[in-house]
């Protein structure tokens, strides 16, 4: 039996268990008072929805999270020469993808690896070993708020659905600025996040204008939430209905 990689799942088991447990408790309470039947149905339905979403995200026919993640690499206009950084690497899927696509590149992944998600540095290294890219990849614990690298250290920088999760940064645009700080002049970047949530980033046109004011050579917004492969059910605001991507060159 071949050894399998494990890249985790965006839909946590905890939310499925939570909805299921509350739903079961409410079902029991309906025996005492019928009014509990409505919230019971809602929680049981929520449990079923998130269980389906977890299946579809990682191992369903669509392999949705793999395809969404691939958009970051597809939009990175880079030659593959030099060093690349993935901010918030999780279990390392983007690091591995970059290392496999660009055989001459060295790729670094950073993450805070908190207990909220099913990710770890050990899992990253194991996946890189299985995928045959361990010699050209490395992983370290770091915060996206203050990256432990010199200005202009990397030739390419990527990130996928991470910035909105960083609680230490009230202004998520500062995370973009910090990511660009460690990118060389002329280097390529591709960041995907919940860019359509205005309380995080404001209007997308204004966001692009702000990035242009920082002196970037090129910057473009891509509405990846409208990708045809994303099922309509997953385009709800609390799923991936607000994702977008900014790409360009410093």
Predicted regions and their residues:
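Conserved SAM-binding loop of SAM-dependent methyltransferases across substrates and taxa
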Residues: 91-103
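Conserved beta-strand signature within the Rossmann-like core of class I S-adenosyl-L-methionine
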Residues: 186-193
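Class I SAM-dependent methyltransferase Rossmann-like catalytic core
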Residues: 7-17, 49-72
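A short glycine-rich, Lys/Arg-flanked "PGG" loop and its adjoining helix->strand segment in the class I
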Residues: 172-185
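Conserved SAM-binding strand-loop segment of SAM-dependent methyltransferases
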Residues: 132-144
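Core SAM-dependent methyltransferase catalytic element
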Residues: 228-250
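Conserved class I S-adenosyl-L-methionine
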Residues: 80-90, 108
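A short acidic, Gly/Pro-enriched loop at the edge of an enzyme's catalytic core
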Residues: 145-157
């Amino acid at each position: 039996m071949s050894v399998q990689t494990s890249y985790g799942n965006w839909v946590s088991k905890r939310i499925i268990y939570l909805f299921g447990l509350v739903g079961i408790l409410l079902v029991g309470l309906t025996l005492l008072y019928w009014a509990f039947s409505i919230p019971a149905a809602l929680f049981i339905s929520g449990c079923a929805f998130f269980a389906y979403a977890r299946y579809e995200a990682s191992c369903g026919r669509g392999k949705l999270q793999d395809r969404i993640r691939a958009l970051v690499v597809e939009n990175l206009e880079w030659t593959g020469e030099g060093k690349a950084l993935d901010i918030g690497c999780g279990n390392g899927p983007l690091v591995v993808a970059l290392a496999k696509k660009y055989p001459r590149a060295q790729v670094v992944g950073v993450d805070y690896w908190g207990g909220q998600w099913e990710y770890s540095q050990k899992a990253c290294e194991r996946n890189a070993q299985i995928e045959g890219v361990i010699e050209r990849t490395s992983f370290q614990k770091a915060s996206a708020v203050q990256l432990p690298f010199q200005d202009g250290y990397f030739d390419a920088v990527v990130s996928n659905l991470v910035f909105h999760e960083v609680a230490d940064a009230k202004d998520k645009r500062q995370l973009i600025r910090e990511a660009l700080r460690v990118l060389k002049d002329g280097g390529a970047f591709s960041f995907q996040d919940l860019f359509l949530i205005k309380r995080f980033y404001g209007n997308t046109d204004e966001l692009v204008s702000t990035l242009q004011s920082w002196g970037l050579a090129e910057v473009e917004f891509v509405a990846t939430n409208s990708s045809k492969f994303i099922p309509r059910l997953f385009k709800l605001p609390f799923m991936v209905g607000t994702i977008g991507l900014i790409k360009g060159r410093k």
